[in-house]
């Protein structure tokens, strides 16, 4: 299902696929390039009506936005060590429902690269099939303890949400448009109305020593993103916003 940049998923987008014999629905809960956070209740209801196996890529929204796998009837959730876990990339995390585990264990498909059946069997003895990135696993362990000590999952979602709200309130008056119709807490996607998005990214990086997120392809000059996950504070946003205002004063934006 292809949507225009920044557009939310709606019932009319799903209607043509109703009752068409599909067996699974794969969705990235948050489309990171344009900052669109998809309506998982809409998708869940569609999958339940059509008896679809629901696989959700939560990599950029995990711990940033609410997600109740059981309530939504999701069968597989995928995330990673980067993004809101704020660890180096290198560990993929998959959570399987009982239905998904049963499906894996009963599949006749021969896997040559990534066999979840082997992973599940090794999990019974607390192991992985092959040596994982042990250093990153230890970092994830420490990070989860930190999250647990600071209000748990709900506390982390609230913290990230508060940072997103703070930033979005503070940029009012700058020549930027928020392009997403359905925002995630994880990131704010901005379209500069007076300058190239990529030129702004370079200027902020080279002259102010700060990194915002550029885009590629046909969005290179139209959209950049500012993240709200990881070890960020309101002081970081104050510095970035001051840089934006300085660029406006200099008529760069």
Residue ranges and their predicted role:
Residues 218, 222-253:
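PLP-dependent enzyme catalytic core of the Aspartate aminotransferase-like
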Residues 3, 54-55, 178, 212:
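Hydrophobic beta-strand scaffold residues
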Residues 9-63:
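Active-site phosphate-binding strand-loop segment of PLP-dependent enzymes
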Residues 70-82:
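Conserved active-site segment immediately N-terminal to the catalytic lysine
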Residues 82-166:
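Active-site C-terminal subdomain of aminotransferase-like
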Residues 176-207:
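Conserved PLP-binding catalytic core of the aspartate aminotransferase-like
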């Amino acid at each position: 299902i292809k949507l225009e940049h920044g557009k939310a998923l709606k019932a009319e987008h799903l209607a043509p696929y109703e009752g068409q014999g599909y067996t699974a629905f794969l969705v990235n809960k948050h489309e990171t390039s344009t900052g669109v956070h998809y309506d998982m209740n809409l998708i869940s209801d569609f999958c339940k009506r059509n008896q679809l196996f629901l696989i959700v890529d939560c990599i950029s929204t995990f711990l940033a936005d609410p997600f109740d796998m059981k309530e939504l009837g999701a069968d597989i959730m995928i995330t990673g060590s980067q993004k809101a876990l704020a660890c180096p990339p290198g560990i993929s995390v998959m959570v399987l429902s009982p239905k998904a585990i049963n499906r894996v264990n009963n599949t006749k498909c021969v896997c040559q690269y990534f066999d979840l059946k082997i992973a599940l069997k090794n999990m019974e003895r607390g192991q992985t099939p092959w040596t994982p990135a042990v250093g990153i696993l230890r970092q994830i362990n420490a990070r989860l303890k930190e999250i647990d000590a600071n209000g748990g999952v709900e506390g982390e979602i609230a913290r990230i949400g508060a940072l997103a709200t703070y930033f979005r309130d503070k940029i009012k008056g700058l020549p930027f448009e928020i392009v997403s119709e359905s925002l995630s807490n994880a990131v704010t996607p901005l379209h500069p109305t007076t300058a190239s998005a990529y030129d702004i990214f370079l200027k902020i990086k080279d002259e102010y020593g700060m990194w915002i997120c550029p885009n590629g392809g046909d969005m290179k000059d139209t959209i950049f993103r500012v993240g709200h996950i990881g070890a960020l504070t309101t002081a970081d946003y104050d510095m970035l916003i001051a840089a934006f205002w300085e660029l406006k004063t200099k008529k760069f934006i």
